[in-house]
Amino acid sequence: MRLESTGKPDQYKVWLSDEELDTLRRHAGSKRNDLILQLGGYVGLRAFEIPQVTPQHVKRTSDGSNYRLRVPEGKDTTGNGGKPRDAYLPAAVERDLHQYQQENDLRPSDPYVSLTESGVRAVVKRVADATADETGDDDYRHVSSHDLRRRFAQRLLVDERMNPRVVMAVGGWDSFKAIEPYLNAPSEQVVNDAFQGVDLGV
């Protein structure tokens, strides 16, 4: 992982790899906590959006093989209240959501994660600390809920080179300026690939 200074004491932007996200998931401690990690890292939900989603917000697309997750009130920078959006829901995450609903007898209107925004952030912090304790890598202690969304954006924009307009639509970004930081930050694998076969003179 790569740490980027924010200019504030002991606060960093953390650029995770998928392998590091998997490591966090292995130390989640519960299925609910793992869902929080997945909704942030694979679906791109913000901390305040995660408690909004319920089983009734999962929709199958017309082709029958893809899913969307309706976010009722996403971020709206215009100040007119939350903006709904349909996030792309990977099939593996949909299966885990469905299984969690069945195991916990959730009604269609019950939230998958019955926490406040600060509660979601606290879960990620606890999981990050537990991961640091178990792996001996203290960089994990800096991981926040927003870093999960950062991995989501970097995966699509840099690793997969997806059309930025698609990423903006499913992730709830209003402008190219908002996603530019993700476009300009190569992932660890992209850096490794760039140096393959390069003569460094040593």
Regions found by a protein language model. Name each.
Residues K125-A169, F176, E188:
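Short, basic (Lys/Arg/His-rich) helix/loop patches that form interaction surfaces
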Residues G40, P51, M168:
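The alpha-helix within a helix-turn-helix
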Residues M1-D22, T78-P90, L106-R107:
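DNA breakage-rejoining catalytic core of tyrosine-based enzymes
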Residues R2, V14-A47, L200-V202:
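Basic, Lys/Arg- and aromatic-enriched nucleic-acid-binding interface segment
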Residues R70-G74, N192-V198:
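Short Lys/Arg-enriched helix C-cap and helix-to-coil transition segments
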Residues Q52-D96:
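Conserved tyrosine-mediated DNA breakage-rejoining catalytic core shared by Y-recombinases
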Residues P90-Y140:
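Active-site/catalytic core of tyrosine-dependent DNA strand-transfer enzymes
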Residues G171-Q196:
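Catalytic-site neighborhood detector that most strongly recognizes the C-terminal catalytic loop/helix
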